[in-house]
């Protein structure tokens, strides 16, 4: 389970280093293997441990090739999907098309989302957080059945 937001940097070769706090789990449970793809709703990347990606791929396989929206989702997620393995220093190379999609240049944020990570350009992440905060403040949470009794 992954949580927390970590500021990270891309090196000159387009590599990121996964923070140490996640590396042991990625090594022990997922053999250092990840799949990177795009987020179809935001300008960020999604990093799935290989076993989590297999579940996503099974869901994608169930989508129709004849229904345009379903086909477009498959095309985006599978077309950009890139398998990678962490090196001995916990680094992974981000392919140029994926870096371009998420506008990643130097400074980035790696955000744990339970079963996966999101990878954001740092400025885009800050903007997204502010937009989310405002949206939550303006939302009538009681009107949302799923959130009406939600408490932390």
UniProtKB/Swiss-Prot annotation:
Pfam families on file: MraZ (PF02381)
UniProt key word ATP-binding: no
Keyword Protein biosynthesis: no
One of the GO BP terms on file: negative regulation of DNA-templated transcription initiation
Superkingdom in the source lineage: Bacteria
Gene3D superfamilies attached to this UniProt entry: Transcriptional regulator MraZ domain (3.40.1550.20)
SUPFAM superfamilies, A to Z: AbrB/MazE/MraZ-like (SSF89447)
GO cellular component: cytoplasm; nucleoid
Key words of the record: Cytoplasm, DNA-binding, Repeat, Transcription, Transcription regulation
Domain called SpoVT-AbrB: residue spans: 5-52, 81-124
CDD domains in the cross-refs: MraZ_C, MraZ_N
GO terms, molecular function: DNA-binding transcription factor activity; transcription cis-regulatory region binding
Cell compartment(s), UniProt: Cytoplasm, Nucleoid
Family stated for the protein in its record: Belongs to the MraZ family.
Subunit structure: Forms oligomers.
Name under which the protein is recorded: Transcriptional regulator MraZ
